[in-house]
């Protein structure tokens, strides 16, 4: 089963979570990693920031992505690193 079929067959995922997963999958490098900010994801998919955050949480909870915090040299946060599993 392809990743596309697997995502669409999973009834635990909302439409917004599927859209965000496809967005991340499309932007991931060869190792499955990408780092768009929530604001960028929301803008590109025409979602509210909160809806994008909920979709990311749903994907992490169901094991479709892994989310790791990233930090600048001064210790402030920047966009998360997402790994598409």
Please report, for each region that a protein language model flagged, where it lies by residue.
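Intrinsically disordered, low-complexity basic tails/linkers immediately adjacent to helix-turn-helix/homeobox/MYB/SANT
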Residues: 75-85
């Amino acid at each position: 089963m392809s990743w596309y079929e697997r995502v669409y067959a999973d009834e635990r995922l909302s439409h917004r979570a599927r859209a965000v997963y496809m967005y991340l999958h499309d932007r991931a490098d060869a190792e499955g990693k990408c780092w768009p900010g929530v604001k960028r994801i929301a803008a590109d998919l025409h979602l509210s920031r909160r809806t994008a955050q909920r979709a990311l949480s749903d994907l992490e909870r169901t094991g479709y992505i892994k989310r790791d915090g990233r930090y600048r040299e001064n210790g402030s946060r920047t966009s998360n690193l997402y790994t598409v599993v």
